Amino acid sequence: MAHKKAGGSTRNGRDSESKRLGVKRFGGESVLAGNIIVRQRGTKFHAGTNVGIGKDHTLFALSEGKVKFEVKGPKNRKFVSIDAE
C-alpha cells in the first residue's frame, strides 16, 4: 500500500493587495477640475499652479486645462501644473 506522510507547514503564502499608484494623467493630456493626476506615497511630485494636494499626497486638478510636468528649483524637484486652455 502506498502511503504519504503529512506534509510540513509553511510560513509564506501572503501578499498585500497592489495600491494602483502612479501617474494617471500624462503631460499634454486635458483634464477637468477634480481629475486625479498622480497617486503617490509622499511627495515624489509636487503641486504646481492649479494643482491641489490631498491628505494622502494625491495630486488633482483645480481647474480645466492641460497637464504639464516640469523639473525646477535648486533641488531639481518634479512639479505638476495645469496650463489653462
Curated annotation (Swiss-Prot):
One of its GO terms (biological process) is translation. This is Large ribosomal subunit protein bL27. Keywords: Ribonucleoprotein, Ribosomal protein. Pfam families: Ribosomal_L27 (PF01016). One of its GO terms (cellular component) is cytosolic large ribosomal subunit. NCBIfam families: L27. The keyword Ribosomal protein applies. The keyword Ribonucleoprotein applies. It comes from the Bacteria. Belongs to the bacterial ribosomal protein bL27 family. Residues 1-22 are annotated as: Disordered. The gene is rpmA. GO terms for molecular function: structural constituent of ribosome. Signal peptide: none annotated.
